[in-house]
Amino acid sequence: MASKKREVQLQSVVNSQNLWDEMLLNKGLTVIDVYQAWCGPCKAVQALFRKLKNELNEDELLHFVVAEADSIVTLQPFRDKCEPVFLFSLNGKIIAKIQGANAPLINRKVIALIDEEKKIAAGEMARPQYVEIPLVDSLDEEYGEVHYESNVEVYNMAVINPDAVLMRKNLEIKEKITKEGFIIEIQENMLLPEEVAREFYNHMIDEPDFEEFVYSMTNRLSCVLIISQGEDTEVIEEEALPQSDDEEEPDPLEEPHVRFAPMLVKKKRDSLQEYMDRQHMSDYCHVEDDAVKVSKFIDILFPDFKTMKSTNVQRTLGLLYPEVCEEEKDNVLDIIQNEGFTILMQRQVVLSEEEARAVCHVHEDEDYFDNLIGYMCSNNSYILVLMREHSVERWKELIGPKTVEEAYASHPDSLCVRFASGNFPVNQFYGSSSKAAAETEIEHFFPPQSTLALIKPHVSHKERMEILKAIRDARFELTQMKEMHLTPEHASKVYFKITGKDFYKNVLDVLSSGMSVVMILTKWNAVGEWRRMMGPVDPEEAKLLSPNSLRARYGIDVLRNAVHGASNMSEAATAISNVFTESNFEN
């Protein structure tokens, strides 16, 4: 009887719609065992629930309930099912479901959600936007008996480990993920913060080398991916067609012949983890699919991501025709910034004939087209990468229609009208036609470039982290990174241009004093941008001429000037090839 009493105290009984509605008023987490009247609640997990209740000791935050599907209208989809179902209600919202008595999974889910609630209550984190799931049985979903749409995007997070990044396996893994139809929403090579590494790999906590593993993940470069499921694939299946009444009866001794008709159906894609397992990529990449945990990791690692997704922040390519570029560029740039655009990249360029034809293709049927192309190919245009919410549409709206005549009639306040030219009756501005077109055009006009960068041994760990943050803030992609002791042999692969100089021995003395961080940094004009960030070679001169540069902030003298970078693209390519080769991976 004592055991029976403990079970009643452990799990409240909900056997009517009114009691269900009252239960949803619970604060915190309520774990609901959905059961059938004929078989009763799942006894296999009651010991786990008791253990969680005792160990977590959070009576105000953690509640356990048994709910009879037969008596509750809301639970109708779960009636007459044999497999146990556990629902997780967080402050009245059903956010997760587990099919079957999967005790380890239930345990992880409860602990993670309670930990979230504690941190929220303590003001240590903002409440994530929890996903409310529809109450649909998994079999119904599989066979299409119930259909629903969710406007809430659910993400997985994948971390490709440092060894795989160093061997460039991350490129292969990303290609396979996208070819399967998954969408990589954001990707970045980074050092994992310790709190993220410990929680993300919490399943390994009992491994004897866990602390060593955490150190590796927080001091070596991993590739972090935030991935959405993408659309389910459409496949053609064949459906049997009934024979018509007037067809001859088949010979009973013959094999029956059934006619099939093609039918387009949606095939549910495997989960990301299942796909990774099937492709034998799990040794290189770990996946987290718990929506609550992924939401938390996104808040820590990519704090702007949710805002950018919800407001549809995007990039577009803008172009100023030569006459505007020469005479009105500064005025136009002021207008662009006043309209809320951020100018990410900009350059002056003379278009090739192919580029000019692509930009001016809307005028190709006009008599003046050839003259326009000649004009575009003989003078400087100004190209920009612009960012804001709905950037593609907003920029096209700002610049107006393709001709001055149309603009006067429908968009008199557009840039087309304000900066109309007498040479050609066309809009003196260009914008990408779509988000996809924008990304293609941006990569064409602002192709990524890589340079070799080095943080010298005298820079402290704290300062090193600050430099890495500055690199990230400057929108460099940290393509590769490794910590190296630059012996004379290794140093000559980086400083090959000065090995014959008198001062080279002094350089070797500085480099041999400790560990350096060697990196490949990638972005458009990477060589020039990194040299600008570094500042003048002498830190004292840097403090006068470029006080915010890295050498001004972290340099001590000419030799210990904090950072180093290639002087030009040729030097960068040679140094990268020297340092980041397969023979050096084990350094």
Curated annotation (Swiss-Prot):
Q: Which residues form the Thioredoxin domain?
A: 2-119
What Pfam families has UniProt attached to this entry?
A: NDK, Thioredoxin
Task: Report the subcellular localization.
Answer: Cytoplasm
InterPro entries recorded for this chain? Answer: NDK-like_dom, NDK-like_dom_sf, Thioredoxin-like_sf, Thioredoxin_CS, Thioredoxin_domain, TXND_domain-containing
Keyword entries, A-Z: Cytoplasm, Developmental protein, Differentiation, Disulfide bond, Hydrolase, Repeat, Spermatogenesis
Keyword Signal listed? no
What biological-process terms (Gene Ontology) are attached? cellular response to reactive oxygen species; cilium assembly; flagellated sperm motility; spermatid development
Q: Does the keyword ATP-binding apply?
A: no
GO cellular component terms, alphabetically, are: axoneme; cytoplasm; nucleus; outer dynein arm; sperm cytoplasmic droplet; sperm fibrous sheath; sperm midpiece; sperm principal piece
- What would you give as a GO molecular function for this chain, any one? 3'-5' exonuclease activity
Q: What tissue expression does the UniProt record report for this protein? A: Testis-specific.
Q: Identify this protein by name.
A: Thioredoxin domain-containing protein 3
Organism of origin: Rattus norvegicus (Rat)
Query: Lineage of this protein's species?
Result: Eukaryota, Metazoa, Chordata, Craniata, Vertebrata
